[in-house]
Structures are given as C-alpha cells and as structure tokens.
Amino acid sequence: MASATAPAAAVPTLASPLGQLRHLAEELRLLLPRVRVGEAQETTEEFNREMFWRRLNEAAVTVSREATTLTTVFSQLPLPSAQETQKFCEQVHAAIKAFIAVYYLLPKDQGITLRKLVRGATLDIVDGMAQLMEVLSITPTQSPENNELISYNSVWVACQQMPHIPRDNKAAALLMLTKNVDFVKDAHEEMERAVEECDPYSGLLNDTEENNSDNHNDEDDVLGFPSNQDLYWSEDDQELIIPCLALVRASKACLKKIRILVAENGKKDQVAQLDDIVDISDEISPSVDDLALSIYPPMCHLTVRINSAKLVSVLKKALEITKASHVTPQPEDSWIPLLINAIDHCMNRIKELTQSELEL
C-alpha cells in the first residue's frame, strides 16, 4: 500500500558566500550589453526633468550604500553565512536594477548626447559593482586591502559623479565639445614638442637605451627595434610636417569656435541640431590622431596625404553643419569661409609635397 505521506520538498542548497558573490558579478556583467543597446521606456506621461534627476541621484546613493555595506562585511573574518550573503546579494542586485530602470526613463527627445552621458555613468556603476563583487569573492586572507579599496572606490566615485552630470542637452554638448578641444590640443602640443626636439621617439627610446645599453645593434635589429634611418625625419618629412601642424591648429580653432557658438547661441530645446554638431565634432579628434600618428618616422607620405584629406573632409562637414544650425546667426558666419580657406591652403600644400608619391 502506497504511503499517504507526501515526500518533503527538497530545500535548495545555497552556494557558499564567496560563490554567491562570483555569481552576482556574472549576473551584473550580463546587464551591461542590455544597458548599451537598451531603448528609453515608452510612456505617454510628460517627462519631469526635476523628478528624473532626483530619482537618479537617490538610486545612486542606494547603490553606494550597498557597496559600502558589502565591502565592510566581506573585508573581515568571519564571513557572513550563506543566508546572510543571499540577502546582501539580493539587495545589491535590486539597487543596480533600480538604477538602470531610472536611466531607461530618460527619453530620446531630451537629447542623444545627454542620454549617452547618463548611459556611460550607468555602465560605470554597474561595471564598478561587478568588479567589487569579483574582488570580494577572493578570500580576505588572499585579497590585498588596496585592491578592495580601489574596487569599492570606483563604485563610489561613479555614484558621486551623478549630481555633476549635465542636466540638459546643451550642457551635455558643451561638455563633449570641451573634451574634444582638449584632445586636439594635447595632440597638437605633442606634435609640436616632437618637432621642436627633432626627436620623435626621445621619451620611448631613452628608456630603451638605458635598459639595453649593453646590447648590440644587431640584436636590436633582430628583435624588431627600428634602425637609425627609421627614427628621424628626412628634410622632405620635415617640410611636410609644417602644413600638417597648421591643419591640426585649424582643427583646434574650429572646435573652439564651435564650442563658443554653442555656449553663446545654443538653445536647450534644439536638441537634434546640438546632437548633430556633437556627432560630427566627435569625428575630429580621431582624425587628428590618425594624422598625428602618420607623421612619425618612418613616414609614408601617401598615408599622410590620405589622413590629411580625411581630416579636411570632417572639418568641412563640421563647419557646414554648424553654419546651417541655429548656433550660427547670419552676421556671425564670416569666420567660416576664412577657416575653410586656411584648411584648403594646408591641404593644397600637402598635395604639392606628396604629388611625387602618386606618380610612382
């Protein structure tokens, strides 16, 4: 006769505390691709900017608090029990998901540039928390204190940055334009310094020479170190660098002028035009970098010509978009033809100096 007593339900076995942390780190990392491609939540309600930022800041405070709690309990012995760890992990996971949910409330019509900044901050927080879980999952006796502090600090810093994120698309555009100006300024200064010293690899090679002073040149050749003829510019190279530097200076001037126009004339409600200006301006710095890298010896003049042409194309497109936008009133656009003439002059000179490369 079969027993009338039903078998007792099996009680799920919890993973070890450290195992739970490792699992949570994996779960958090799975959220990253979704945040990168996730769309804004559709709603018929009017967007309340003040409420959104208040909720986002509150969510960041909650994440920071959970990071503090977890770091405290797992940085010392004895470790919490499996049941206690489960509760801690659930709280961390809930705090992260709540933060992501608030990010999804930011609609696209508030500006793509602004949304990219908030998305980047969200990714920093999620990734920082995942790093913290991974470090804490190492037993405290094997985990250096500074590693734990660094990982926790990355979460904390990301959360602390939330109140400083621009609140509208104009402010976001100005932040991105300022970064682009700084990038191009750094590239230009590096190029000028290399030209003034006539020794483009001085910083790198000085260290190499000190560490390998007893080695023979033949050994360097075998190991792939450049020979002397590859380390310095020829007279033709130096002549070609002059218009390249001028072109990079024009790029810096272009970005600075665009930033000034956005600051003085940009309207917060013209989000699409501001996004277009930022999008094309974002292409200037990488194009400058490509040109800057191509002038280092051994220099290929054809590559310099190609990279210069790419940069010129981007600059003219940026000027065209800026001129057609609301940030450039009609009386204030006289600088654009002057800058285009300067850009064309640089490119024409580069073409003259590299024409022989095309005829080979």
From Swiss-Prot:
- The organism's superkingdom is given as Eukaryota
Name residues in a coiled coil: none
According to the record, the residues making up region (Interaction with TCF3) are 2-184, 150-360
User: What's a Pfam family in this record?
Assistant: GCIP_N
Query: Where in the cell is the protein located?
Result: Cytoplasm; Nucleus
Keywords recorded for this protein, A-Z: Acetylation, Cell cycle, Cytoplasm, Nucleus, Phosphoprotein
Where is the stretch described as Required for interaction with CCND1? Answer: 2-208
Q: Where is this region: Interaction with RPLP0?
A: 2-190, 240-360
* Cellular component GO terms held in the UniProt record: cytoplasm; nucleus
Post-translational modification, as annotated: Phosphorylated.
Q: Which residues carry this modification: N-acetylalanine?
A: 2
Purpose: May negatively regulate cell cycle progression. May act at least in part via inhibition of the cyclin-D1/CDK4 complex, thereby preventing phosphorylation of RB1 and blocking E2F-dependent transcription.
Q: How does it assemble?
A: Interacts with CCND1 and GRAP2. May also interact with COPS5, RPLP0, SIRT6, SYF2 and TCF3.
**Which protein family is named in the record?**
Belongs to the CCNDBP1 family.
> What name does UniProt use for this protein?
Cyclin-D1-binding protein 1
| UniProt organism field | Pongo abelii
